[in-house]
Regions:
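Cell-envelope and extracellular/periplasmic
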Residues: 26-480
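Bacterial Sec-dependent N-terminal signal peptides
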Residues: 1-27
């Protein structure tokens, strides 16, 4: 055997020895979500889980608990145990000990944990909005002062998978101008608003991908169980680099999170499903129901953002998708932030004002989830209509005082008779109702408000929150 052959044999033996050592002394391993700086949901029975050798005993000790928890890894090497968390507070530590290895997790806070998902408007970071030099410098000052030291950020690395994953890539970060700069702007403004109002730690898990449709974030099995949604199962984008196939982001970027106890979720998506407006309520019901089932913590809050005005190439598609999103409010424990007034540039599908978006989402959470009296949490919502001779009376909820209409309102309200021809309408305010009419329509049957792709708000409640676009008819609308 020559010198080169002897060297190769030695290398092989060393590699084999290392592999053998790792196999017989496999260290306890934790998922990415369980690590330094994490926020755990307060007053909850939370999961702590990971991997180890089959049959290996794992001990979990948390500094807020007087007793440890013990669990034995399954034959597949999985382990999971449940521990209880106290009221919000910290910092705490946690130690996970296996046969030959121990992991200490530090700087743990206990508070409120929220999942933040969707497509590009959730995925848009403060850096993507121009960075601190050009966007909300007053917020930068708050961060630099340390106002949000109890907020923690976790970004799920973008990935796709044809099969459900058990782990993702990412880590919990403390707040500074750098970490916030690279975080979802909508998620940040939502979480920082909660932090200010609740005065307790907040953990934000940001998992989003621009240009994606809702079916990509939904388990395929759930779509298969819904006969009306079969269209989405077989849809494929045709691009390996862009996730357009049903379930691939649920598998890689949602399912790995489902062991981690959350309080609820916020969602900013819809643009990529605008031509699916007829099926969108059923699709979102399936997505929300499947997520709630996967987490197994009941019907957790799910608050979402209605898409803003934009000059889509398909006529009325944006208005029809907004209508579909309104219908999603029939899903239990949901709420919707309206953005008809913050579009700015109708040629930009990404409104720059993410501050108000985050705050409006937080108003829903503070009111409905945390029981705080924040005043108004929603703009006017269309409730019912009544034909009264030559006019139509429109009734609203969430008016919070008298309705308000801007001077451009007459251009946003339209009224039609049985011929289905709409004309600009005159509008009068009567408390929580509007009376809509037109001299050109003697026998009105239907009213529409802001029902165009690019319509902006002209109707607000007493506190200045905008109403969603709506219509009283269900006539077929052309999108070509």
């Amino acid at each position: 055997m020559n010198k080169i052959q002897k060297t190769l044999v030695l290398v092989v033996l060393v590699i084999a020895g290392i592999f053998s050592f790792n196999q017989t002394n496999a260290a306890v391993r934790l998922p990415a979500l369980i690590g330094n700086n994490m926020v755990l949901q307060q007053n909850a029975a939370i999961n702590v889980w990971g991997w180890a050798d089959a049959g290996e005993k794992v001990i979990v000790q948390a500094s807020w608990l007087s007793a440890s928890a013990e669990v034995v890894a399954t034959k597949e090497g999985n382990w999971k145990t449940i521990i209880n968390t106290p009221n919000a507070g910290g910092p705490y530590t946690m130690t996970i000990t296996g046969r030959d290895y121990s992991i200490k997790i530090e700087n743990i806070l206990i508070g409120e944990v929220w999942l933040c998902s969707g497509q590009s408007n959730m995925d848009l970071t403060i850096k993507g909005l121009g960075g601190w030099g050009n966007y909300k410098p007053e917020v930068r000052d708050e961060v630099q002062r340390g106002d949000f030291a109890s907020v923690r950020l976790f970004t799920v690395q973008k990935d796709t998978s044809a099969y459900v994953r058990t782990d993702c890539k990412g880590n919990w970060l403390t707040v500074d101008t750098g970490t916030v700069d690279n975080f979802s702007a909508t998620a940040w403004f939502y979480g920082s608003s909660l932090s200010k109002k609740l005065g307790i730690p907040v953990g934000l898990i940001y998992t989003a991908w621009g240009g994606t449709a809702a079916e990509v974030w939904t388990p395929v099995a759930s779509l298969e169980a819904a006969p009306e949604l079969q269209h989405f199962i077989h849809h494929y984008s045709g691009y390996a680099w862009w996730p357009g196939t049903a379930g691939v982001l649920y598998n890689a970027m949602i399912h790995p999170l489902t062991n981690y106890t959350i309080k609820g979720a916020i969602w900013y998506q819809g643009e990529s499903n605008r031509m699916d407006y007829k099926l969108y309520p059923a699709l979102m019901n399936t997505l929300i129901t499947s997520w709630r089932k996967a987490w197994g913590i009941g019907d957790f809050p799910f608050y979402f953002v209605q898409i803003a005005p934009y000059l889509y190439k398909e006529r009325n598609s944006g208005a029809l998708l907004r209508e579909a999103q309104m219908k999603c409010l029939s899903i239990p424990n949901t709420g919707m932030a309206v953005t008809l007034d913050i579009a700015g540039d109708i040629n930009d599908i990404h409104p720059k004002n993410k501050l108000d978006v985050g705050i409006r989402l937080s108003l829903w959470a503070l009111t409905k989830t945390y029981g705080q009296d924040v005043g108004s949490f929603s703009g006017p919502v269309y409730k019912d209509f009544k034909v009264e001779k030559k006019s139509i009376s429109i009734e609203f909820i969430y008016t919070d005082g008298e309705l308000k209409i801007t001077e451009t309102a007459k251009n946003n309200f339209a009224i039609a008779g049985a011929d289905k021809v709409f004309y600009p309408a005159t509008v009068k305010i009567q408390g929580n109702k509007l009376v809509v009419s037109s001299k050109k329509v003697k026998h009105p049957v239907a009213v529409r408000y802001a029902f165009l792709n690019t319509s902006v708000s002209s109707l607000f409640n007493g506190t200045g929150l905008p109403a969603s676009s709506f219509r009283t008819d269900d006539w077929e609308i052309d999108t070509k």
